[in-house]
Regions:
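Active-site-proximal helix-loop-helix substrate-binding element of RNase H-like nuclease domains
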Residues: 3-6, 10-24, 30-133, 140, ...
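Conserved "right-hand" nucleotidyltransferase catalytic core of DNA-directed polymerases
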Residues: 1, 74, 99-305
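A short, polar/proline- and glycine-enriched secondary-structure boundary/capping micro-motif
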Residues: 25-27, 298-299
Length: 306
């Protein structure tokens, strides 16, 4: 950790930088049990505060989450975009000069400039909260806190042995499916929209459709950017995932990469649940960190594992 900026209520913002031990002593001097911690993208800052320094406040708050629910995609969620929208100041660019640097790489002058940059970020975040938080529903602040805690203070334990066994099973099933495809299905069948649609129907899945912008007529939604086709990559039937992966030329299915990701996490500890508050215009949560915890299979052998 290079340093941190901290503001208590409307007092002056402090910049702190030092060894891990010095930073721990500094943070231990605050009454977190009776405090709310605010940041912009608190999932990131909160994880560092909790995982490295044991900070566990009464409430976590996040101006990024609040902004998504207020502005959607109309303004932008970055601190820079929001600060310009509310005309409260300008976000600095010193962080770009610090990419790849450790604390010991900074000169005294560089560290001082970086501290000023951090202080400015804190002031902008505080001002944003003052502007957006006045009429913000308290019950939604509680929802934001609960959402953040699922990542910052993880409690879900993963069964490493079961996951490793599941990964072997998934890969075996994929190999068998691809062998069966190779016996009766060629690359041209996978790339032909009509024949690929027939393969999907053979698995009991109706192919997704869309209106072609070129012809104005209905056609199959098999482009890799089509929402319906992307949904097939996350289909609860593994056979569908494997079929789509084969068409795309991918070596791994979503089930494989997701299971491997869970295995890597299990070796480190509990599962932080990375979901974003108000990720869509409907207000629903969205997945993050390449793990959509909301889209795990619920039926079949995969549903018993994931």
């Amino acid at each position: 950790v290079i340093g941190l900026g901290l503001k208590v209520n409307n007092g002056p913002t402090e910049w702190a930088s030092g060894t891990d031990e010095q930073m721990q002593d500094y943070l231990d001097s605050f009454d977190w049990a009776n405090s709310m911690v605010l940041a912009h993208n608190t999932m990131f800052d909160g994880a560092i505060l909790n995982w490295k320094f044991g900070v566990n406040p009464k409430v976590w708050a996040d101006t990024l989450s609040m902004a998504r629910s207020i502005h959607g995609t109309g303004v932008g969620g970055s601190l820079k975009a929001l600060s310009e929208h509310y005309q409260i100041g300008q976000k600095g660019t010193e962080v770009l000069d610090a990419l790849g640097k450790r604390r010991e790489d900074f000169t005294d002058n560089d560290l001082s400039r970086y501290g000023d940059y951090c202080i400015n970020d804190v002031e902008l975040t505080y001002d944003l909260f003052s502007l957006m938080g006045g009429k913000y529903p308290r019950k939604e602040l509680k929802v934001i806190d609960a959402t953040l805690r699922m990542f910052i203070d993880p409690v879900l334990e993963l069964d490493l042995e079961l996951l490793e066994s599941h990964l072997i099973d998934v890969r075996d099933r994929k190999e068998k499916l691809l062998l069966n495809l190779e016996d009766g299905v060629g690359k041209e069948d996978l790339m032909s929209n009509d024949k690929f649609a027939g393969l999907l129907r053979g698995l009991g899945v109706e192919p997704p459709r869309k209106i072609s912008p070129a012809t104005g007529k209905e056609t199959y939604a098999f482009a890799k950017t089509d929402e319906g086709f992307k949904a097939l990559q996350e289909h609860e039937m593994y056979e569908v995932q494997a079929l789509v992966a084969a068409r795309l030329g991918n070596k791994s299915t979503l089930e494989e990469t997701r299971t491997q990701r869970f295995i890597d996490i299990a070796k480190r500890g509990n599962l932080p649940v990375p979901i974003r508050y108000y990720a869509a215009h409907t207000g629903r949560w969205g997945g993050s960190d390449k793990i959509n915890i909301q889209n795990l299979p619920s039926r079949g052998p995969d549903g018993k594992t994931l």
